[in-house]
Structure formats: structure tokens, C-alpha cells
């Protein structure tokens, strides 16, 4: 039987949820005008955490300072973020999705997957998806997109098609027509640097990736990432829905600063310490991870977070730190004061696939030896003097 997976994604979640609250209080619908959410609208150094569609058309993006947003749009309506209310909206939205299928995986505060394979009762999948979308809108007052596909990848890709308040399908036999013409950077797990590297080799679309021989792709992005990328570009994804009762354990470490940090080098040193600690805990439990998440809290208590899947299981501090740095660069403009940072690891395995990678990157043996020395010191005392990685190495702390 063909799998049927829904991916449900709230449209401009924080902005939509703030709009619903204002409407219940008799206010205007800020979704219809240039508007944004910020931790502290009165502080021009505060960061934009969400923007309405009219605001996005004016160039208002998340993670830019309020001062910059106001220069782009002097009449921008800015509202204060309300995390307690957001959690309430998230729970309500998930509860409705769970009524359609108990096999649910919450992917973030504003999106989830549900397995509808045995829940359609001979109904059309897109028809059921529209019913779910409309029920959320009617009962909760905000809109979602629902992507429908035969696996998680296709469902998520489909939900990112035209927004808002839409249902889109992306079945395996629709991949060439609907997915292949999209830019390579739209493919799940393809970030900015990978996109730029692909572009340098004349690979511009998802179809270009799909048609490229896997061994040729491996020479560009590395053997392990190439296999996953090639499968994804062809719509192949066998990952199951992981319910909250099945989820693997995660490890995270946060660090709150006595004084807000604005200096990039100082922040990098603190991230280095966090990465060392969280990677040490991972190794101590005998696991490797395939997912890294990065969390930052600004001085106005607004929060930004990202997660990424890495090309192969690892417990190496340098590789984990590299991913955290990359995600930080996507969330922080380098000037907004930061109060707290955190790094999380999840999707654990005991695979030792890095043994093959040692022959591809000689530095890995150096990083492993560094980690061994760190773990040895840590076993003797919690007070570890942080060693510096070799200069020019990917794991090198910047100060």
C-alpha cells in the first residue's frame, strides 16, 4: 500500500498567532498590513522574529533589527512576542492534527507530520487535507498549508509551494513535473553554501541534481551527503514518522551570559565551550548524532533556532561546532546582543561510519585525538582548560 503523509505548516506562525490574539481583543487583523513580531518593539536593537506577507514584500525579513525594518517601512506595525500564547496555539493546532491521525511527529512549534496511510477510509487524500486545513482555520483562526505526499520529504516540499492557506500534493509520479524545476536550494537540507557550490558546477535546479550521476555529485559535496541528496532530488525518503513515544533521546547544553555578548569572536569562544560540553556528553553515552540544532536568545528574550541534518553520524566536536556556526550565521546579523546560546544533538546511532571518512579527510583523525584528550581531562576534573584546535581547522575557535 502506498504511504500517505501530511505535512502541516502554520503560515507565518508567530505573526498569525499574534494576529488572532489581537482580533479576540477587538484589534485589527495585522496579517493584512505590513506588520512584524519582535521581542521588544520599543527597542530599535530588537530583532524581527516574524513578518506578515505584505511586510515580506517590502523586504522585511526575520532576524533583522527593528531599526532596519523601520527604515524599509516607517509605518510597519510591530507587536510584542507572546511565548505563552504561542505555546497555547501550537498545542491547539497539534491537538486537531492528532484527531486525524495518532501517528504524529511534531517537527517544530509550528509544523508536524501525520501518517494518513490507514486513516483515509477510501477518501481522497487532498480532500481530507483540505478538511483538516479548513477545520484549523475555522476553530483556531489561523491558516496552514498542508503538503501531501508518499513520504516525509515530498510532503514537506509540497507544503512549501504557494502560500498561504493551500493544499498541495507531491506524489512520486509528480516529482519531475513539480519538483525538478525548482532551484537546487529549495531541496531539503541544501543550505546556502551547498547551493553556491552546486551553482559553481552549473547545477541550478533539483532536476540537475537528480539527473547527475551520484559519483559526480560526490566529488562536489562528499560521498555521504551525495547519496542522501541524490535520493531526495529523486523524491526518495524512507524515514518513518517518529511519534513522541518513539523519539530518540536528545542532548542539549545552553550557556547564559552574565553580560550580553555582541562581539562575534567572544560569542564564538562561548559556542566552542558549549560544543565541547555537548559533544563530550554524546561520546560518554556511546552515541553519534545525525541532527544538530542551534538556539540563541537575544537581549529582548526573543528566540531564534534552527536544526540541520548532517551528512553522516558524528560525535566529533569540530564537526558539530561547524554546523552550529553555520546556523548561527543564518540567524544572527552579527550586531544584536545575545543573552544565551545552546546546541542540541538528536537522532542518535551507534554506527561508526566515520571510519570510512577518515580516508577522505585526514583532519578527522586530528579532531578525534583532540576529543580523546579532552575527554581524558574531563574524566579527571570538571574544570577543563579548553585546548585550541589546530589553526585553519574547521573546528578552530575564533579567538
Sequence positions of predicted segments:
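DNA-contacting surface of Y-family translesion DNA polymerases
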Residues: 186, 194-338, 350-353
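Short Gly/Ser/Thr- and Asp/Glu-enriched loop/turn motifs at secondary-structure junctions
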Residues: 107-111, 149-152, 246, 287-291, ...
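Short, internal active-site loops enriched in acidic
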Residues: 118-119, 151-155, 297-301, 346-351
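A broadly conserved detector of short glycine/acidic/proline-rich loop/turn motifs that flank catalytic sites
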Residues: 41, 255, 298-300, 347-349, ...
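Gly/Gly-Pro- and Ser/Thr-rich, intrinsically disordered tail segments characteristic of DNA damage-repair
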Residues: 1-234, 280, 355, 364-379, ...
